Amino acid sequence: MRRKLSAIECMIDGNIVYMVRLEGSFQEDRLRSALARVQRKHPALRMLIRKERDGLYYEEDCAPEVPLRIVPRMAEDDYQRESYVELRKVFAVDQSLLRAVWLHSEFESDLLLVTSHRICDGMSMLTIVREVLRALHSDEELVPYEPISAKIMIGDYQPQHPWKRKLMASLLNGALRLIPGSSSTSENNEYALEWNVSPSLTEALKLKCKTEGVSVHAALVVALDRSLLKIVGKKKLPGWIESPMDARRGRLAALKSDMLFFGGGSLKMRTGQALEEEFWARGRAVNEDIRRMVDQEMLDIPGRYYFNELLRPVSNGRIQTMVRLGDALHVNGSWNRLALSNLGNVIVNDSDAPFRLKDLRLYVHSFNFRLLGLVAYALNGEMRFYYVGDEKCLSRAQANALKQEFMALLQHQVDPLNGDAKAFPLVTAAVAQ
């Protein structure tokens, strides 16, 4: 069975890499078995992408086994080199949409898991990591499920006036066809910053958020908004901070928390609002806005899928023209947006595993649109941040200044007497991507 990629799936062209550092040992045959079992569970990992004259197609249940490349681990930072390679390596048409690299040494290993962003978001990738690590030492059954299709997401939804939706889609399709295609590919000059916050500051921030009745995510939104405004100024401020919403977690009956999925809702918060308001008062307002937006997104998802099915995929040449247009117009951020993703407290390893999870990192690369985003997550009691941006969206100097201002602002909310950039206990590492 096969189906054509939707317009959104065609546009989301990029790779995700997760690196897990494991202290302990396991055998190659056990790793291959773990990858195979996880692949058998998830329909998206058994698909291939075929290129036909009229577009891209998913072909189900025909992918070969997950490729595993084994590399001797000679130095602690070898994963950076391999992650860079894997981020930019296009998935071959005859290979699974998951591949693995094992940087092996006697007592410690780095495992890279790589997938296409078309089938997988950050939370889905954590599911893959969790299941692979579990399967390395457990024979617990992984139960397959049916592919998640647009039809399932739409359900019994019907718009009140279908002709209006069809007319709108027809006009949009016509407008997109007028965009000339570009034969050359824009080079994305992405770079990344990574930093960890000490357990003491992480815990203090969590307690402060709880006391103030504000989610950690709402606090991060306010801090990012105000820091970004200070660094780039009002004229260059992206109009929106956009956060992906996990449509699983019991919110949609068709989706279970352990299913691979990409394409849920997103929460868009306008930047530069209520700047005179005290930080935590603004945080409570944002917190309530997020609650309302989540409820509304859950109602809107079926209709959005219905409309997306009416859209025609945009060719890569036209996407490149759109990217160049954005460059020429000096659009703020990534098409006037900055993405903020919060993966929450990451727990992927079992206490009874014969190895210990020492580290987990993630990396993202886009093959078409320019990236600008910040990912937050907590691991082993430490809050961590991964910033990725294209130089045309934010310069390296601006990104470093944003990091310092962002962290100083968070520190100030926890301890106003020591709220400067040098006061917080921070472990930082910059990685060119």
Task: Name the predicted role of every residue range.
Residues M1-R53, A75-L98, K230-Q433:
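Acyl-thioester-dependent acyl-group transfer interface
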Residues M1-S6, I16-M19, F107, I119-L207, ...:
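Non-catalytic, low-complexity flexible loops and terminal extensions
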Residues A7-M11, Y58-E60, S183:
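Short, flexible, solvent-exposed loop/turn segments with mixed acidic/basic and small polar residues
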Residues E23-P43, L113-R130, W195-G233, F385, ...:
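Acyl activation and transfer enzymes in specialized metabolism, enriched
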Residues R32-R130, R134-H137:
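Acyl-thioester-dependent condensation/acyltransferase catalytic cores
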Residues S105-E108, R134-V143, T211-H217, S227-P238:
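Secondary-structure boundary elements
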